[in-house]
């Protein structure tokens, strides 16, 4: 089957993608704040190289622990709690339906780690490219399976 419901982060970069998919599929579109990207605080909009130059000790600590937050931002532990609450709610509300979640790197990594029962620090070991796809099957009795992660095959097809 096709997509039953599209759920997007309300941030513009996700919303634009979700709007395009909704137009193409006719699926209803919902926004969920739980799917918003990590708030990187003072690091927002900077590259990791720029951040590392200005805050070397904080970056080092942040890259070692999900409990460390960027200055003025959210820790990954906080994001994990927020994303898991959104996933719990969405899975309960949309059982037996096919959802397309349009989100950002951190929430997608968190969903994949949850599906694989992987520890939180696994977030630091997953690479996700822009506009990549991740497919996760969630089952009513609890377990989940990651069917694909960081799939970018559609991007090369789109460029032809």
Model-derived regions, located:
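Acidic, low-complexity terminal tails and accessory targeting/binding regions
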Residues: 1-2, 38-50, 92-98, 113-160
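Phosphate-coordination/substrate-recognition cap region in phosphate-metabolizing enzymes
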Residues: 1-59
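Short beta-strand scaffold positions
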Residues: 8-9, 81, 102-103
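Active-site signature of alpha/beta-hydrolase-fold catalytic machinery across serine-
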Residues: 20, 110-114
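Short glycine/proline- and acidic residue-enriched helix-loop micro-motifs
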Residues: 58-78
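Generic structural signal for well-ordered alpha-helical scaffold segments
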Residues: 80, 84-92, 112
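Beta-strand elements within well-structured catalytic alpha/beta cores of enzymes
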Residues: 97-103, 107
């Amino acid at each position: 089957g096709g997509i039953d419901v599209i759920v997007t982060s309300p941030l513009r970069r996700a919303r634009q993608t979700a709007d395009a998919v909704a137009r193409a599929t006719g699926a209803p579109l919902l926004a969920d704040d739980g799917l918003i990207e990590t708030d990187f605080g003072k690091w927002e909009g900077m590259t990791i190289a720029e951040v590392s130059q200005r805050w070397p000790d904080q970056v080092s600590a942040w890259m070692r622990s999900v409990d460390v937050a960027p200055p003025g931002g959210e820790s990954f532990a906080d994001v994990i709690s927020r994303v898991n609450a959104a996933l719990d709610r969405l899975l309960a509300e949309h059982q037996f339906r096919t959802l397309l979640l349009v989100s950002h790197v951190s929430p997608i990594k968190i969903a994949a780690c949850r599906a694989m029962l992987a520890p939180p620090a696994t977030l630091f070991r997953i690479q996700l490219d822009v506009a990549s796809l991740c497919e996760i099957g969630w089952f009513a009795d609890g377990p989940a399976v990651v069917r694909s992660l960081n799939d970018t095959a559609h991007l090369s097809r789109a460029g032809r």
